[in-house]
Amino acid sequence: MGPLWALRVAGALSVAGVLAGHDGSQRAGQPAALDAGTRGDGVGHDRGVDCREVRKRNSSERCRFVRGTPDCRLDGGFLDYLGGAFCTFPSSLLPLSVSLYALWLLYLFVILGVTAEKFFCPNLSAISTNLKLSHNGLGVVGHSLTPALHGVTFLAFGNGAPDIFSAVVAFSDPRTAGLAVGAIFGAGIFVTTVVAGGIALVKPFAAASRPFLRDVIFYMVAVFLTFLVLYFGYITLGEALGYLGLYVFYVFTVVLCTWIHRWQRGDGPPPPGPWEPAIPTDAEEQESSGTNCGDYGEEYRPLLPYHETSLHILSTALSPLDKHKWRRKPWYWRLFKVLKVPVELVLLLTVPVVDPDKDDLNWKRPLNCLHIVTGPLLCIFTLKSGAYGLYQIQGVFPVWALVALAGSVLAIIVFVTTHNEEPPKYHCVFAFLGFLSSAMWINAAATELVNILRTLGIIFELSNTVLGLTLLAWGNSIGDTFSDLTMARQGYPRMAFSACFGGIIFNILVGVGLGCLLQMTNSQMVVKLEPDSLLVWILAGALGLSLVFSFVAVPAQCFQLGKAYGTCLILYYLVFLCVALLTEFRVIHLAAT
């Protein structure tokens, strides 16, 4: 009763805060209401001529229109996709440019996945270990609570990094805010229907009652708050902070529920929450021992130790291929690995990885010294599309040269004062550098992803919302889909099912809260989120209805989930997708008033 009572109070306070933030007449500094505008983008924005008008122009005028229309300017990013489609390529080759953009879009999802899995998550785990969260995270609470705290904070951030960065980038421009709304809601309904339903089809199981009800209630509260924000048309500073505060309260509730269960059961291990795996059996340990966050440097080690030269260490560390794994893997794995090699090689050159599970903590002396130079250079060249790196001090000395010089001096000092065989005491600092560098890579890839989706939306005259709930949501959720279904096949459907609902809570609360918070300035403490399309309301309503269905159906089945439940969820998503596409193409629309 304690956690549920606290949840009711928090929900009431959150709703009251949203309503209080929107009562009365328009306040000073509050954005004026916007007209719906042409061709709904899902979330309104104040603009002149819509860039989608380019398709109505003659072929000879399209390049001039794109160059001269403010709405066609893509903020951030390194490539001008609209200019490439309408200026670089002739109009007769537009299908070719679209095909190239589609392939590049798929590869961007590969970049996001590889960066998050192989570099961002391991460094985040190393930071958690260095902060002692994996040993005595809460002191007074006890050791067994720490996995829950670690899971809903560090692990949630690691798994949701592509979604969060995509949302932050999309919210940075009112023209692409519909992408963020569509992706957050679209991924939510996809994961809670298709992925959750697939788990029930693959492996019928009994769901954990209290964690399931807790997560669904929190997610319904988050969806309802977002619905209110969209209804009133803007989000204030207090409301953005309220999103983040609600997630902090969710973390507190998870830890409290774990502590209560442990107290009731004595000193036994707590049940697995949405982010913490159950204590593995011997067979499970054998299975998990063959996997690791990173598969670099996993060559078989000789029985007798020997001293490797720095050149050999560098060449081995920069090789993304493991010849032993390559021989025993199927052809399709090899093909995908070949596609990932260029990305992995660039990441290996610029992002250090600290692995607490290895004896040497993945200390590669020559490569880590190189990272001291390449990591900071990466950061300044990815900020503002390289604008900071090209800035010249006093109009003479470029910033990138100063960073390279300072990094080189520091790298030489580290190389001279360390050894190949033993990591230095300050090796944990490389985890923070790796975290920052991988975050910059994810942010850069997310920026390109948002820009190319907006370009495809302009070319095909599609709204940002439908692109967000389809391509962006599917791309960001594909990793969770495969991992959860694989986990279910291996005999852990309860853990996979809990992850479906627990993970998306982080995405919606932190994605909306942090994404809007970062766009606020001292002069404008509000972010406009006015939906000007029926599709936004269909998306929000469909997500809310799916959560209500699960909230009622799962307890009605005594938490025994089988193929009937899974089939209903997947059919529900297919019906929703058909309605969404029919709405996008104006087959379903509101009657004119």
Swiss-Prot record:
Predominant localisation class: mitochondrion
Family, similarity comment: Belongs to the Ca(2+):cation antiporter (CaCA) (TC 2.A.19) family. SLC24A subfamily.
Domain of life the protein comes from: Eukaryota
GO CC annotations on file: membrane; mitochondrial inner membrane; mitochondrion
GO MF, one example: calcium:sodium antiporter activity
Membrane topology value: Multi-pass membrane protein
Start and end residues of each stretch annotated as Disordered: 268-291
Glycosylation sites: 58
Catalytic reactions on record: Ca(2+)(in) + 3 Na(+)(out) = Ca(2+)(out) + 3 Na(+)(in)
Residue intervals on the Cytoplasmic side: 115-135, 200-215, 261-334, 391-395, 450-454, 518-533, 586-593
Keywords on record: Antiport, Calcium, Calcium transport, Glycoprotein, Ion transport, Lithium, Membrane, Mitochondrion, Mitochondrion inner membrane, Sensory transduction, Signal, Sodium, Sodium transport, Transmembrane, Transmembrane helix, Transport
Free-text function comment from the UniProt entry: Mitochondrial sodium/calcium antiporter that mediates sodium-dependent calcium efflux from mitochondrion, by mediating the exchange of 3 sodium ions per 1 calcium ion. Plays a central role in mitochondrial calcium homeostasis by mediating mitochondrial calcium extrusion: calcium efflux is essential for mitochondrial function and cell survival, notably in cardiomyocytes. Involved in B-lymphocyte chemotaxis.
This protein's name: Mitochondrial sodium/calcium exchanger protein
Signal peptide: 1-20
Bilayer-spanning residue ranges: 94-114, 136-158, 179-199, 216-236, 240-260, 335-355, 370-390, 396-416, 429-449, 455-475, 497-517, 534-554, 565-585
Side of membrane Extracellular, spans: 21-93, 159-178, 237-239, 356-369, 417-428, 476-496, 555-564
Protein's gene: SLC8B1
Subcellular locations according to the entry: Mitochondrion inner membrane
GO biological-process terms attached to the record: calcium export from the mitochondrion; intracellular calcium ion homeostasis; mitochondrial calcium ion homeostasis; mitochondrial calcium ion transmembrane transport; regulation of lymphocyte chemotaxis; regulation of store-operated calcium entry
Provenance organism: Gallus gallus
